[in-house]
C-alpha cells in the first residue's frame, strides 16, 4: 500500500504519552502481544535515534514496525524517502492518518521477513545502500537483522532499538558470557556501537526488560578473509550450541560438520590452540582461520 500525502512537511506531532493515548483511543486500537508492540513515548530518545542514524535528505530509510507512525514522522523530516513495513493491518488506518502530512513515506502492510528488501532498495533507491532504523519487536530481532545481512541487502547502517541483553551480545568479545554466534555474525558484517540504554518507562506498554539503541555500521569489506562463508557460520553455530563442551566436541557432535574427530582436532591444534579450548575463547579471525583450514579437507 502506497502512502501519499501533502507537499508540506510538518514537525512531528507524536512522541509523548498524551498524543499516543489520543491516537490509540481514537481508533480503538488494542496492543497485540504476538507482534511484540511497545510504542516509544519519549521525544528525547527519538531525537537520539535520529541523530545517531546520521540521516540526510540523500537517504532512503527502511523502518520496520512503525506502529502508529511516531518515529516515522521524525524519519520523514530527516530523510529523502522512508519505506515503513508494518505487519499489523489494524495499524494501517492509523498510519494513513498520522503520516498524511508526509509525502515521502510509503507504508507496506506485510511481514518484513517475507519482503524482498533488495527489491525495495532497487525500486526506491536505485539499488544504492539504504539505512535501516527501527524500534524492533524483541521476539524477532535476530531473524530480522540476520535476514538483512544474509540476503546481502545494500545497507549503510542499521540503527535499532533492541533488548539490552541482545545489544550487549552484539558488541561483546571473546570470554564474555554474552559472547556467541550473534556477536560473531554481527561483527562479521558490521561495527556495533551501543548509543544509549533506554528504560521501560519510555514505552507504552512498558516492556519487562531494559532496552538499548545500537548502531551497526556496515563494513565495506569483511574484516576477515574466509573462503567459505557458509562453512564458517556452521562452525560458529556448532561451537556455541553446546557451550559447555570443548570446541572439538561441539564440532564433532554437529550434524552440519561431518568430519572425523581427528581432522577437527588437528585443525584446532594448527591454530595453536589446545584440545580443551572452547568456542567462546576464539575471535572472529580465529574462526575464519579454522574455517579455511577445515574447508581444505572437505
Stretch-by-stretch model annotation:
Residues 1-238, 269, 280, 289, ...:
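Catalytic cores of RNA-modifying enzymes
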Residues 218, 237-298:
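C-terminal lobe and adjacent flexible extensions of AdoMet/dcAdoMet transferase-like proteins
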